[in-house]
Amino acid sequence: MLMPKTALALLQLPPATVAALEKLGADLAVARLRRKESLKTWAQRMGVSVPTLQRLEAGDPGVGIGIVATALWLIQRDGELGMLAAPEHDRGAIEMDVRQAVELGRARDRAAASARLRAARQKA
């Protein structure tokens, strides 16, 4: 029997990300239990198998994003999905933009100083 391949990306997840997925899964399990839904009923509502739901609730990073989105939709938290990677929250890209702007400002300052120096030499 062939074993399914595990994507290298899933094996390289940082521990903090693995912990976040496990917490998300546990929180989704709590949400299901608070609604007094069985694994079987909740899985049917999601359109997945019970083992897939169990993997989701265990924080398995191999569970598809569509399944995660469906679970969030069932607990009315899917609206947050659109903000997860919103550009205005991308701290790394914002920091890069700031560094580039600072460097551009420095380059312009150097160019202006060089131009002033050339102009002063031409007058002399």
Q: What are the roles of these predicted feature ranges?
A:
Residues 77-80:
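Short, charged/polar surface micro-motifs in flexible loops or helix N-caps
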Residues 26-42, 104-106:
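Short basic helix-loop element that most often maps to the first helix and adjoining turn
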Residues 60-74:
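Short, basic-rich loop-to-helix N-cap that marks the start of a DNA-contacting helix
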Residues 1-20, 84, 88-124:
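N-terminal flexible/basic segments that precede or flank functional cores
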Residues 45, 71, 84-88:
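Short acidic/histidine-centered micro-motifs embedded in hydrophobic/aromatic stretches
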Residues 36-54:
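Short alpha-helical DNA-recognition segment
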